């Protein structure tokens, strides 16, 4: 009997990521309005605290929620996660005008719990769904990454439009979307899951043993470094550098989107990037699903360096030398195409490792949230300091360093896997 399509879950994931991207925009606009009309001075430090509250909650709870999904079944978490998100955006509508920060911090903690419940459950579910089909696994994980990146990009656009049209009631629109996402999770087909019944101490011992396995232990620094690149290039830092009025004849990208229609031009550039990145993910999903995971990840590091060379050339092309873009832009696209293979390959690799601990699949896949969160915090923090010292070049320098660290660990892992395969082949 053929299995039902996993499309409802991927659609639900896309909607959740739309809400994630839109909520960041709408919340920022809401806080700006709150400062203007309520007379309460909300600073950049306060906004940073809200982000820290969300990430700290998600990072600390994701493994625990993944372990619970192993014991109780993933469907509960797939459905309850979006419902908690619905509650979170609804509560924002009731933010007090006097001293709103403690209330908003609590609301962000609720958002972190929602994400911690949902992401490990989705990845554990997809690993269960593709347990006996490696080629399907690569395709499904690529589609998950496409739903994630595409949803966030669409959400950023939707957030601004929703705020302009509906004001505070944009949060009500987000609540409706959370409800639709929960319905999609309900429609996701049932899949075979090995339910964990042992006590938490035994689970903890197994988890620590899994973490210390060379396949995963060597891989962790590489993935954190690549996730840090997302914190550098897919955060407000790059928007700030491109949009801030700044004239530097030696770095033409600094302030290149400032001035009239700068926001529109920036949206077109970022939108074009996300569209191309999504098309690259589709390619990796349907045409190269039989390429070894580690080889794809090594190819992605090559792509990072190609993109860095292109960005350096664009940034230092010199005034009036726009003709050189004919060389640098295609090179940049080649780099983006190659580097886009890392995320789906890494997710498929992590799912492969989970086959060795099928009972703890949700707990293990919860590492995705930890890697992504730690990496983004690292990229945002270091990116700000590098950009302060060296401008746009600083982001390129940091990217080169992080990619080099990732390359070292991937080569170590590649060598170990090759040796293990040789031993297996010799022993039969």
Identify what each model region corresponds to.
Residues 107-148:
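Cytoplasmic helix-loop-helix junction between adjacent transmembrane helices
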Residues 59-96:
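Conserved MFS/SLC helix-loop-helix module at the cytosolic interface between two early adjacent transmembrane helices
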Residues 117-131, 341-356:
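Intracellular juxtamembrane helix-capping segments at the cytosolic ends
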Residues 83-98, 303-321:
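C-terminal ends and interior cores of transmembrane alpha-helices
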Residues 54-63, 152-153, 274-282, 373-377:
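Residue-level signature of mid-helix packing/kink "hotspots" within the transmembrane helices
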């Amino acid at each position: 009997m053929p299995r039902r399509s996993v499309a409802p879950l991927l659609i639900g994931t896309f909607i959740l990521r739309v809400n994630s991207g839109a909520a960041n925009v709408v919340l920022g606009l809401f806080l700006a309005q709150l400062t203007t009309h309520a007379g309460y001075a909300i600073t950049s430090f306060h906004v940073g605290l809200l982000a820290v509250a969300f990430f700290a909650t998600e990072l600390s709870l994701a493994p625990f929620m993944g372990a619970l999904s192993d014991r109780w079944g993933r469907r509960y978490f797939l459905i309850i996660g979006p419902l908690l998100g619905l509650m979170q955006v609804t509560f924002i509508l009731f933010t007090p005008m006097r001293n709103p920060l403690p209330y908003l911090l609590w609301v962000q903690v609720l958002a972190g719990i929602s994400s911690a419940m949902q992401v490990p459950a989705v990845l554990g579910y997809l690993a269960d769904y593709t347990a006996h089909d490696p080629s399907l696994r690569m395709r499904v994980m690529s589609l998950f990454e496409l739903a994630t990146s595409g949803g966030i990009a669409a959400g950023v656009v939707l957030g601004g439009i929703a705020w302009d049209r509906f004001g505070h009631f944009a949060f009500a629109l987000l609540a409706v979307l959370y409800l639709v996402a929960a319905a999609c999770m309900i429609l996701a087909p049932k899949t075979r899951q090995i339910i964990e019944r042992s006590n938490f101490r035994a689970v903890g011992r197994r988890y620590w043993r899994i973490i210390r396995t060379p396949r995963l232990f060597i891989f962790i620094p590489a993935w954190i470094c690549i996730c840090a690149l997302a914190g550098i290039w897919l955060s407000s830092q790059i928007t700030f550098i491109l949009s801030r009025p700044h004239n530097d004849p030696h770095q033409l990208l600094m302030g290149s989107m400032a001035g009239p229609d700068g926001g529109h031009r920036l949206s077109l550039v970022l939108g074009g990037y996300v569209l191309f990145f999504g098309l690259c993910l589709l390619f990796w999903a349907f045409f190269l699903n039989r390429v070894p995971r580690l080889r794809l990840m090594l190819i992605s590091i090559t792509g990072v360096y190609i993109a860095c060379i292109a960005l350096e050339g664009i940034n230092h092309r010199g005034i009036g030398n726009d003709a050189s873009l004919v060389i640098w832009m295609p090179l940049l696209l080649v780099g983006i195409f190659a580097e886009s293979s890392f995320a789906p390959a890494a997710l498929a690799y992590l799912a492969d490792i989970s086959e060795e601990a099928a009972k703890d699949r949700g707990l293990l896949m919860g590492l995705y949230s930890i890697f992504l969160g730690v990496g983004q915090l690292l990229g945002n923090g270091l990116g700000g300091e590098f950009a302060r010292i060296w401008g746009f070049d600083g982001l390129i320098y940091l990217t080169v360093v992080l990619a080099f660290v990732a390359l070292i660990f991937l080569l170590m892992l590649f060598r170990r896997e090759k040796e293990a395969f040789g031993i297996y082949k010799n022993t039969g």
